[in-house]
A protein has these predicted regions:
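Rossmann-like flavin
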Residues: 1-2
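Active-site-proximal catalytic alpha-helix in oxidoreductases
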Residues: 6-34, 38-52
């Protein structure tokens, strides 16, 4: 049992927000996403937005897969030292993972099923909007996943070029 249930839950949401939609939109596997500069940078920025919303809501976020929440947020805001540390941690995690690891949202897209995007990137964006915290990447990620669900577009790494 934890006295910090909401902080731990939001921290889990941060991990999901930085990975699931991005893999669904790009079609990339977990290691492709985390080891390549462009998707990794988008992932870190998605996390940063989610962390700032959680902090503004008063949640005490916990370390996520060896990454301090504040350091991860700063990495997404361009702090070079924080970014170097986060890139190292993501690389360590990728080396422990199989190359065919695929987040559940990407699997849902592959199978033509509706995703939980409204409860991940969409939820971050909604809560951010309610408290005046901008979450443009989470908003865009949610919209892209929904467009893919409706078969308006196909998953592709090119979809994150404008991020």
């Amino acid at each position: 049992v934890t006295p910090n249930l909401w902080g731990e839950r939001w921290s889990k949401l941060v991990i999901n927000a930085m990975r699931n939609g991005l893999s669904a939109v790009t079609g990339l596997y977990g290691n492709e996403r985390d080891l390549n500069e462009r998707p990794r940078w988008v992932s870190i920025r998605l996390a940063s937005e989610a962390i700032r919303v959680g902090q503004a809501l008063g949640f005490e976020l916990v370390p996520m897969q060896g990454m301090d929440p504040e350091q991860l947020a700063l990495a997404g805001e361009g702090d070079r030292d924080s970014l170097a540390h986060v890139v190292e941690k993501l690389g360590e995690a990728a080396r422990k993972r199989r190359d065919d690891q695929r987040p559940s949202m990407a699997q849902d897209i592959d199978r033509g099923r509706r995703t939980e995007t409204d409860f991940i990137n969409g939820f971050v964006a909604k809560k951010g909007g309610e408290i005046g915290i901008a979450t443009p990447l989470n908003e865009k990620m949610n919209a892209l996943v929904k467009s893919i669900e409706r078969n308006e577009i196909k998953p592709s790494p090119l979809l994150i070029e404008g991020f």
